[in-house]
Amino acid sequence: AGFPEQEPEPKFWNDWAQKTLDKALSLQTLNKNKAQNLILFLGDGMGVPTVTAARILKGQLRGQPGEEGQLEMDKFPFVALSKTYNTNAQVADSAGTATAYLCGVKANEGTVGVSAAAVRSQANTTQGNEVTSILRWAKDAGKSIGIVTTTRVNHATPSAAYAHCVDRDWYSDNEMPADAVEAGCKDIARQLFENIPDIDVIMGGGRKYMYPKNTTDVEYPGQPKHSGTRKDGRNLVKEWVDRNTEKKGHYVWNKKDLLSLNPTKVDYLLGLFEPADLPYDLERNKETDPSLSEMVEVAIKILRRNPNGFYLLVEGGRIDHGHHEGKDKQAIHEAVEMDRAIGRADLMTSTSDTLTVVTADHSHLFSFGGYTPRGNEIFGLAAFISDVDQKPFTAILYGNGPGYKLVNGARENVSTVDYQDNSYLAQAAVPLSSETHGGEDVAVFAKGPMAHLLHGVHEQNYIPHAMAYAACIGQNR
């Protein structure tokens, strides 16, 4: 791909830097407006290496070298670092971290919406240790609230916004041990509808956890693995519909029904587009499955009608899944789609009254390197072969994961396989069935009112405090 022809001229770089300097100087007038609206974009597993790779991919999808491009999040004026550790884990999981950036307190791994006094899977440590989230603070302040995710709506990230649960895996009562049910613990799907009964917009996957056991799925009638899971016989979707129909509530399960809604006539929306997680963006059926950008657009159109403003949590949740599976291509394309959603939200909001924050819960053992030349195809090979085993290697590698593979006792020669395939497993140094999270700090990008409060190296649980202060909600009313 080479590089733009003006780059050898010092003037090009000096002019660019001076323009950037002008922008930086304009930031000396801080935006101290009150934030009417709050949007948090959470890229699950979107560490800095993932952000950089997504930037390059975004440019290359447009036929450019990629490195010089800008993601939407790159344009945000304020950037901080977030320390992601959980109270009991150096390398964090998505549940304890979600409790931090949504509820404002650090917590143990595997737990959502409870303090560190609660112990994972120990039902009797729930009561008295519940902590509320910024979603609740916003609702209490009269704002509309929404959750949009590409995972199950009762997955770790969204669940910390409304649930108090000592185990992130208690998706429905089917996944709970008997002692937890007897102790009166509620599964996460139930809590979605009962704890904050009037969440205005809920979109994502997770249909099967809402229906009685063996209820056939509407989209996959011939596949028992997608059938309902609930042992208590409740149909949570029907209960929601019965409760909300007269309040301009609509339930949808496919893209056509979603996009045929008139958002000015919808007050409550429940969209469950898959039995579990939504498909990867690269594998999405563009006729039946909405993209993250499409869901975000509908959500904002509904939420912004509230004169008191709104809080919206948007999760690009499958960046994380791609990395765990060692499928670098899926992960990075997911990150690019989340960036598109950030751009869509930008077109629909104003920095004068909307604070937008983009961050990750944790990183991954994902890296790219190998002295690749400018414009090197991001999923391509490094420019030279190994001087140890005389074989080529891809620029992208994982520290551990399912991509560890030996052929005749030696590292696989990647030139003999299709490393451009969507489901190719990038090579990993240590064999694991699932690649792990990374422990380093993650970036926090912020723009809008009081965005300058996100400015240095912070504990992750500081994020909702800064956002709440900007909107004068929660402890900062």
From Swiss-Prot:
Q: How does it assemble?
A: Homodimer.
Binding-site list for Mg(2+):
D44, H155, T157, E315
Q: What is this protein called?
A: Alkaline phosphatase
Please name the source species.
Answer: Gadus morhua
Temperature note: Thermolabile.
| Single annotated GO MF | alkaline phosphatase activity
Instruction: Write out the similarity annotation.
Output: Belongs to the alkaline phosphatase family.
Return the InterPro entries for the record.
Alkaline_phosphatase, Alkaline_phosphatase_AS, Alkaline_phosphatase_core_sf
- Location within or outside the cell: Cell membrane
Q: Which Gene3D superfamilies match?
A: Alkaline Phosphatase, subunit A
